[in-house]
């Protein structure tokens, strides 16, 4: 009996499999799956509702309609199991076989499979080397194709029209064979000898010169090799037999009223069967060719529609005009099999309800309505009731629960105790969107949620709903408690800062309790303990904000964790003393002895977590919340109209601005300024007026003057409610207060341009109709934007998750020695991100030395925690090599050392952590906060971009980075290199600021000189680009002929004349070939050379250059020979926000990218063509020169004869990530993408750790292009996973063979997701048909390595707790121990089962 149960359990388990292979099915294979041929299009008999014989629902083919009962009713009950009824031919078995038994249709004429024909690139076309158009013409009977040319002049695969065919017949008779339709294509495919083709193409490849032809041949070779290695035969792409889906997967359901609801597939199959039968009959009758042809074409079309409706021609529609859903539609898209049923399922033991606040809960609790709990925990309750003997059977227990007997509630309490439940709020944007809590039973119907977890869920209580899920098994409960409990998720995985931070009311209450007030009641009292201070407050002797002296007791935790108490007297307020009571032992009182805003509270919690650990922090957070709520109530802060104080200065400031605007308007009308300038100036005037008003308002609001107890006036922070809310960070911001009490300011039109008349009123004064109308513009656009943003952000997250889903920590240390070098991020002079924030939680890649010595400060493989970062700061280290995911050497995963600290836990990351998904969520989750718009640069912004000097902010020492310079006659330095940077170093050697300085900058100080804050140290002209001479001498004009290559112009204002070089297009034919230049000679007229080389000092002048010198003039080093006017670069729109992030991760090439030098060498210009310049770079080592054609309108940064390094910018523009990777390497491209993405997020004040972006970049760099195949089996130009090549190369090197050489390639995230090795993952992402077609042709197998594939096949994922499970299975496999089934034969089991059932039957 036990054996039987074991056997039945065993039946549920499928055999273990290690992968899934996809391939083409041969006609014989399809027949072997089938249980019979479907010959008739009938479905079921409409009177008896029984399936028709040999029809689409035939019981004989597919199995019985009722369990263990044949169709005619001769055999019923289990004992006849396996009998085939002789009357109706139905096997007596379970009805569920109708879900798995397939049928088939023998097609009267072969039919091409539309996926292999039409999904691009067409596989059949590639195989036959014919165009898709031609093949379609053959298939749809429009022309003939030659199959066997025989002894004629025709060629195999040649297309013949009807006339050509008849002509050929007359000429050659039956020497040759030509056909049309799928038979023709079938014959052509059959005739291909794969081995021979491969040999031929391999021989042919090296000799091909044309790039396109080579690409085509490689593609074809890869396809044919795929067929050859996978054992697929090309003719299987043409169907001779069509499989029929099991009927229960395309059900026909009777509705009431005699109608039927049916799956579209039945209609499509019926069409195919009808046409197939008609074709058979026509062939039997030997009908005229044209009729048969038409029928064959129709059969082809109906099969196309069944497989992929709408891919060719118009989609076949049903009775209600909508296209029928074909087999391809069943699996693709959001509603398809993959995304609807395999990746996301509905689960039982779940419920949902509205949420409300639970301010009395502890952090690990949630309030669960009794009704819900009763329903969710039913099986547990039944079990308990039965176990206690309160109910004899499950049925009785059920009745008790339905009647809600008193005992049931006691049992429920017991069941629920310590049984965590999971709460989830949609949309689940990151892993904190599902957390576990211990339920507390409550009355009512709403779930109660702890206020501190709202931030993680992004929940509010305006009607949000949440879902509850019950973990059933012990393991599930354990995981929920250990990993998902809200108390274990205090830090955000995105940036490692606390996410359980009080907000709103709580912040306001804590801020209120910690404020001080001048001359408050009880000021200057002294208390011997905190308790005494509190007593004084409770009896009313002192108020909360009074400044007093209190003796406090602090616990100090020493180095070794020993605790010592110490007492001291502090100046504080009563409120802060009371607040210090909840401070956990071990934290200093100074942390609360300040105004507690949101930032301070967050820091306090962070410090608490780092110093005292999880438990204390959780308790403390709860206490903070209770205290905050209590004192927020006591504070009575509320918003009244009198709190919005309008500054008196407002009206005069507005009047001044209006006067200025009128003045500009007058200038415009008299033609002194252009329309554009006028608009920009007006907007600037109003923007600055708005700033001034809001400044005056904030000064007015934020402080008040009071009389202190010595009778003197003293300023103190104001207790204005609105100001307190904003200052504490509880709600609102200066910008919002400005609209309430300042002026509303400038508004934008929906297209993003600014309306030049601002709204001068504020909300307290009220808006008039026009002002209100202008406001609605922006407000409505905001709403529309939000809707778009949500969708876009969600799609970005989906792509990120898809590309990174298979990255898991799989080993401890890969031993990689290289890493990324981290420096503080400095932008335009400010330190945006100090070094400690960038390296915190990373592992050191190379020993960090004490600056200036060779003594090791932090050895390799140190995990830099807070203490180490403090050390680095003390010793002013300004660059650290840290290990990074990008340089990790692990194949198919990442090692813990390269990843560093797990941000959500604060220690080094665990094995099996799914870092890819965490990274994707961290980047995607704040997506909705990013803006959607592209910024038009106008007004203030565009002038800021035309900087012309560097003003230092900090005192320090001047240092130049990769700069070449010459000293001019005034003794100043002139920069003559391109990408130079200037940095200010403080006395500790730390870099404080850094600026880019262009070519031609004049420096007022020498390198290494001391500079003071506010000093201007560098100047340049932003509107022209000078040509600086590096030698002194006299100038000689070359090819500068007036009227041919140059013209003279006289400046109207100054009367000075200057020479302007004509552009090539403007010159006469005589001047086209001339190259105007300035040559430098000494006093004797001999050519001078550029110092250190034998290159003559000759400077070629580009078109439009202006020369202010005359022939033979004397000049000195560092003077400008000529100036090239720079058109103020067209105000480009900078793509901001979400679209910019998407562009970076998709690695899109910008429209007009910067042009970078492909090789290092010397620049020269070759012969020009119409509209283009020829740029030639001659390498210094005398290799082949590199040529590139550059459009004339691009501003070049280089002159003839200048030396450039590989990857240097030649023409400005946005840099393309692909170019950076190719020319400057992986480290640079990684830095570029990380910094660009971070810029967008930083602008919105969102913190994301660099690690997460690096994880995505690793996935973007996962493929490479083979440049030299060596002895490997890769093809040149093939795209392969880097890990694959590395593994292959290791084997080759071990065998002493030539390894393959490769070049890394950067793929956008969509491309990278579709290019994964796992076809299941790729198919469930996008372009399902294309992915599956490609996989089938190549006979790919999926090893189920990633997370997504395992979810789809219904296994534990190989990450987290499933990581060990997969590891153990791999071990068991390696040692060959497969799980053995118990020794019981099927017949024994049947016998046992029959006995059992008969026993049960006799008892009834």
UniProtKB/Swiss-Prot annotation:
EC number: 2.7.7.6
Binding-site list for Zn(2+) 2: 814, 888, 895, 898
Record-linked InterPro entries: DNA-dir_RpoC_beta_prime, DNA-dir_RpoC_beta_prime_bact, RNA_pol_asu, RNA_pol_N, RNA_pol_Rpb1_1, RNA_pol_Rpb1_3, RNA_pol_Rpb1_3_sf, RNA_pol_Rpb1_4
Keywords annotated in UniProt: DNA-directed RNA polymerase, Magnesium, Metal-binding, Nucleotidyltransferase, Transcription, Transferase, Zinc
GO MF term list: DNA binding; DNA-directed RNA polymerase activity; magnesium ion binding; zinc ion binding
Catalysed reactions listed for this entry: RNA(n) + a ribonucleoside 5'-triphosphate = RNA(n+1) + diphosphate
Membrane-spanning segments: none
Domain of life: Bacteria
GO aspect biological process, one term: DNA-templated transcription
Positions contributing to Zn(2+) 1 binding: 70, 72, 85, 88
Residues that bind Mg(2+): 460, 462, 464
GO cellular component, one term: DNA-directed RNA polymerase complex
Co-factor requirement: Mg(2+); Zn(2+)
Cofactor binding, note field: Binds 1 Mg(2+) ion per subunit.
Record-stated family: Belongs to the RNA polymerase beta' chain family.
Oligomer and partners: The RNAP catalytic core consists of 2 alpha, 1 beta, 1 beta' and 1 omega subunit. When a sigma factor is associated with the core the holoenzyme is formed, which can initiate transcription.
Function according to Swiss-Prot or TrEMBL: DNA-dependent RNA polymerase catalyzes the transcription of DNA into RNA using the four ribonucleoside triphosphates as substrates.
Protein name (database record): DNA-directed RNA polymerase subunit beta'
């Amino acid at each position: 009996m036990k054996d039987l149960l074991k056997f039945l359990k065993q039946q549920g388990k499928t055999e273990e499999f290690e992968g899934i292979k996809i391939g083409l099915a041969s006609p014989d294979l399809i027949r072997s799956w089938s249980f019979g041929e479907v010959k008739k299009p009938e479905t079921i008999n409409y009177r008896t509702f029984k399936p028709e014989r040999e029809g689409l629902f035939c019981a004989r083919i597919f199995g019985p309609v009722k369990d263990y009962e044949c169709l005619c009713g001769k055999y019923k009950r289990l004992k006849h199991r396996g009998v085939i009824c002789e009357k109706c031919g139905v096997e007596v078995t379970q009805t569920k076989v109708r879900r798995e038994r397939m049928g088939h249709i023998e097609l009267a004429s072969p039919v091409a499979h539309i996926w292999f024909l039409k999904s691009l690139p067409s596989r059949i076309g590639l195989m036959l080397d014919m165009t898709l158009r031609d093949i379609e013409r053959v298939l749809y009977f429009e022309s003939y194709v030659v199959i066997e040319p025989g002894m004629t002049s025709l060629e195999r695969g040649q297309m013949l029209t009807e006339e050509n065919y008849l002509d050929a017949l007359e000429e050659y008779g039956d020497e040759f064979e030509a056909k049309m339709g799928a038979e023709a294509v079938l014959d052509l495919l059959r005739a291909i000898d794969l081995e021979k083709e491969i040999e031929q193409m391999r021989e042919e490849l090296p000799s091909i010169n044309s790039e396109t032809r080579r690409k085509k041949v490689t593609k074809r070779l890869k396809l044919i090799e795929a067929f050859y290695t996978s054992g697929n035969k090309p003719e299987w792409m043409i169907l001779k037999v069509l499989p029929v889906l099991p009927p229960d997967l395309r059900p026909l359901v009777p509705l009431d009223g005699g109608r039927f609801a049916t799956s579209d597939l039945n209609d499509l199959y019926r069409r195919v069967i009808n046409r197939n039968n008609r074709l058979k009959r026509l062939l039997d009758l030997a009908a005229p060719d044209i009729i048969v042809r038409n029928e064959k074409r129709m059969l082809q079309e109906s099969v196309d529609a069944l497989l992929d409706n709408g891919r060719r021609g118009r989609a076949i529609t049903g009775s209600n005009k909508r296209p029928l859903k074909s087999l391809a539609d069943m699996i693709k898209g959001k509603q398809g099999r993959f995304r609807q049923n395999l990746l996301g399922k509905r689960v039982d033991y779940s419920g949902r309800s509205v949420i409300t606040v639970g301010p009395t809960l502890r952090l690990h609790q949630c309030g669960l309505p009794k009704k819900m709990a009763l329903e969710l925990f039913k099986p547990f309750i039944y079990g308990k009731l039965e176990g206690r003997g309160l109910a004899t059977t499950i049925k009785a227990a059920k009745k008790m629960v339905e009647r809600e007997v008193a005992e049931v509630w006691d049992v429920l309490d017991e069941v629920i105790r310590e049984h965590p439940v999971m709460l989830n709020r949609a949309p689940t944007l990151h892993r904190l969107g599902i957390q576990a809590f211990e339920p507390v039973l409550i009355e009512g119907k709403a779930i109660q949620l702890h206020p501190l977890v709202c931030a993680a869920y992004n929940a509010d209580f305006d009607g949000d709903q949440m879902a509850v899920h019950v973990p059933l098994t012990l393991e599930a409960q354990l995981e929920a408690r250990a990993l998902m409990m809200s108390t274990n998720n205090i830090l955000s995985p995105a940036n490692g800062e606390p996410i359980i931070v009080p907000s709103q009311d709580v912040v306001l209450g804590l801020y209120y309790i910690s404020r001080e007030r001048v001359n408050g009641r009880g000021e200057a009292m002294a208390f011997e303990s905190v308790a005494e201070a509190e007593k004084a407050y409770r009896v009313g002797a002192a108020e909360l904000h009074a400044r007093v002296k209190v003796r406090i007791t602090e616990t100090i935790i020493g180095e070794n964790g020993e605790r010592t108490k110490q007492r001291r007297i502090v100046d504080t307020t009563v409120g802060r003393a009371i607040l210090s009571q909840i401070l956990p032992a071990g934290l200093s009182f100074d942390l609360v002895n300040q105004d507690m805003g949101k930032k301070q509270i967050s820091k306090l919690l962070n410090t608490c977590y780092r110093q005292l650990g999880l438990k204390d922090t959780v308790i403390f957070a709860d206490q903070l919340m209770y205290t905050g709520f209590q004192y927020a109530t006591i504070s009575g802060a509320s918003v009244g109209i009198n709190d919005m104080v309008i500054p008196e200065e407002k009206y005069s400031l507005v009047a001044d601005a209006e006067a200025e605007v009128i003045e500009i308007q007058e200038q415009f009308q008299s033609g002194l300024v252009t329309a554009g300038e006028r608009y920009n100036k007006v907007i600037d005037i109003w923007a600055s007026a708005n700033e001034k008003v809001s400044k005056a308002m904030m000064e007015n609001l934020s402080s008040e003057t009071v009389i202190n107890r010595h009778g003197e006036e003293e300023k103190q922070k104001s207790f204005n409610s609105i100001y307190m809310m904003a200052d504490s960070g509880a709600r609102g911001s200066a910008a919002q207060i400005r609209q309430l009490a300042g002026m509303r300011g400038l508004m934008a039109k929906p297209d993003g341009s600014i309306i030049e008349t601002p709204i001068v009123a504020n909300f307290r004064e009220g808006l008039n109709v026009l002002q209100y109308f202008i406001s609605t513009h922006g407000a409505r656009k905001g709403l529309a934007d939000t809707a778009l943003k949500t969708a876009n952000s969600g799609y970005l997250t989906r792509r990120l998750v898809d590309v990174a889903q298979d990255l898991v920590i799989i080993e401890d240390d890969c031993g990689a020695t290289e890493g990324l070098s981290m420096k503080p991020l400095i932008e335009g002079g400010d330190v945006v991100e100090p070094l400690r924030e960038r390296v915190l939680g990373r592992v050191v890649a190379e020993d960090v030395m004490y600056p200036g010595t060779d003594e090791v400060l932090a050895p390799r493989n140190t995990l830099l925690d807070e203490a180490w970062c403090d050390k680095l700061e003390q010793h002013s280290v300004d660059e650290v090599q840290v290990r990074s995911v990008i340089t990790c050497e692990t194949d198919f995963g990442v090692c813990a050392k390269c990843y560093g600290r797990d941000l959500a836990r604060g220690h080094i990351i665990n094995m099996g952590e799914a870092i890819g998904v965490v990274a994707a969520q961290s980047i995607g989750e704040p997506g909705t906060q990013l803006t959607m718009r592209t910024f038009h640069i106008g007004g203030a912004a565009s002038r800021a971009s035309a900087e012309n000097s560097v003003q230092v902010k900090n005192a320090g020492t001047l240092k130049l980075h990769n700069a070449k310079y010459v000293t001019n006659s005034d003794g100043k330095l002139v920069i003559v290199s391109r990408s130079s940077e200037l940095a200010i170093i403080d006395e500790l050697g730390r870099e404080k600021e850094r600026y880019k300085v262009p070519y031609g900058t004049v420096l007022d100080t020498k390198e290494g000189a001391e500079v003071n804050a506010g000093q201007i140290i560098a100047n340049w002209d932003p509107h022209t680009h000078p040509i600086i001479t590096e030698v002194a001498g006299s100038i000689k004009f070359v090819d500068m002929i007036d009227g041919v290559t140059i013209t003279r112009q006289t400046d109207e204002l100054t009367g000075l004349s200057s020479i302007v070089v004509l552009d090539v297009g403007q010159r006469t034919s005589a001047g086209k070939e001339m190259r105007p230049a300035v040559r430098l000679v000494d006093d004797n007229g001999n050519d001078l050379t550029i110092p250190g080389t034998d290159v003559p000092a000759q400077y070629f002048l580009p078109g439009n250059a202006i020369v202010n010198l005359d022939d033979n003039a004397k000049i000195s080093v560092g003077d400008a020979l000529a100036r090239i006017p720079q058109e103020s670069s067209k105000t480009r729109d900078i793509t901001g926000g979400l679209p910019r992030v998407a562009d970076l991760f998709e690695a899109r090439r910008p429209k007009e990218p910067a042009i970078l030098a492909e090789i290092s060498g010397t620049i020269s210009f070759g012969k020009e063509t119409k509209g283009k310049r020829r740029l030639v770079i001659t390498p210094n080592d005398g290799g082949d020169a590199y040529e590139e054609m550059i459009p004339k309108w691009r501003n070049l940064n280089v002159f003839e004869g200048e030396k450039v390094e590989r990857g240097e910018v030649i023409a400005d523009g946005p840099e393309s990530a692909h170019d950076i990777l190719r020319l400057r390497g992986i480290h640079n491209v990684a830095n570029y993408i990380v910094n660009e993405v971070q810029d967008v997020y930083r602008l919105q004040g969102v913190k994301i750790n660099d690690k997460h972006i690096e994880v995505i970049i690793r996935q973007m760099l996962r493929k490479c292009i083979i440049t030299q195949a060596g002895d490997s089996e890769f093809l040149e130009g093939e795209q392969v996973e880097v890990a694959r090549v590395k593994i292959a190369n290791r084997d080759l090197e071990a065998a002493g063979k030539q390894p393959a050489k490769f070049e890394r390639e950067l793929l956008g995230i969509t491309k990278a997701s579709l290019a994964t090795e796992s076809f299941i993952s790729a198919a469930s992402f996008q372009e399902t048909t294309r992915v599956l077609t490609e996989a089938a042709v190549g006979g790919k197998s999926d090893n189920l390595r990633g997370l997504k594939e395992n979810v789809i096949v219904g296994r534990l994922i190989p990450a987290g707790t499933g990581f060990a499970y997969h590891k153990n299975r791999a071990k068991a496999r390696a040692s060959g121990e497969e799980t053995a089934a118990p020794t019981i034969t099927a017949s024994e089991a049947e016998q046992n089962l029959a006995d059992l059932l008969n026993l049960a039957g006799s008892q009834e």
